[in-house]
Amino acid sequence: MNSLKFLDFCAGIGGGRIGLENLGMKCLGFSEIDKDAEITYGEFFGYDEVNYGDLMQIEPEDLPDFDFMVGGFPCQTFSIIGNRCGLDDDERGQIIYGLVRILKAKDVKYFILENVKGLIHHDKGNTLKVVLKLLDDAGYRVYYEVLNSLDFGVPQMRERIYFVGVKKELVDDSFRYEFPKKYSGKSESLEECLIECDRTLIFDESLPAYQTFYKYLDNKYNNGKHNIDELLSHEYRVLDTRQSDLRIYHNKTPTLRRGRHGILYVREGQFRKLSGYEALLLQKFPKRYADKVRGKISNSKLLQQAGNAMTSSVIEEIAKSFMKAIGEKK
């Protein structure tokens, strides 16, 4: 796979890129319009990387030739937590058309695309059918599956739908592909990810928000179910302070999402707020990358960006198994 070249579309902060680079593929550039994400991407990979900008404005002839497309196309119009708009909603829902336009114009051999699980059932499954038909009409054999990052080396519950495709002329009619079920590399435990030492992230009674949390435990949804001492009695217990109820997790975290706040965990008898650095580790960003942005990018921005990112180990494992099935050798 060392000879394969790829472009990183709707790149975010490069989770997909890391997954492919772990297999020896070479990145020729990326496409991202969020300026804050672009800064973090630059800290990770260098500011000399070529950003081709707005996917919908790219002229294919301005792109280099490449073999592999990776992209996490925007999920807002499909997400089960969004407003359930669809492909006809706005430009966010049109991004798939921009990706297909480039796939066809550049005659790209392979792709991996990611979206939220909610895409499957949106509009009673019609949105999924449209996406699959677009890719099929573009000349690809397409496979899709919902995978959970929890099975791929990180202690985070994160279900996403993944699409993989190969040009039809590169495989015969007997070709079949089955998605991997688990990660073949080193898995990280919760304790290995929740390692932040910054004391400003301790959540205790000295903070005004702590009193809000105390009242939250007594609201109509949580009243009588939990108390502070009991919650603090389990190391690395994770608390998700949703509006309706308190959800508790052991040995794993809930899905990181853009705009999600209120994830706490217990360590050494104290509540701590999840940090952006820790969120990167929960997305399988290597520490050497997370260290590059420590103290440079604000905690709130890193939390948002990690929540938007692709889990690098999932992309790595899919690409490895897909290329093995096709016959490419690393």
Positions of the model-derived regions?
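Conserved beta-strand signature within the Rossmann-like core of class I S-adenosyl-L-methionine
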Residues: K109-L113
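Core alpha/beta nucleotide-donor-binding catalytic domains of modification enzymes
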Residues: N2-D107, K117-H121, N126-K129, K133-D136
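Charged, glycine-enriched surface loops/patches
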Residues: T127-N148, V166-K168
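S-adenosyl-L-methionine-dependent DNA methyltransferase catalytic core
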Residues: M1-C27, L134-A138, R160-K330
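Short glycine-centered, acidic/aromatic-flanked micro-motifs in structured strand/loop junctions
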Residues: N115-H121, S149, Q305
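Conserved S-adenosyl-L-methionine
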Residues: Y52-G53, K117, Y140-D151
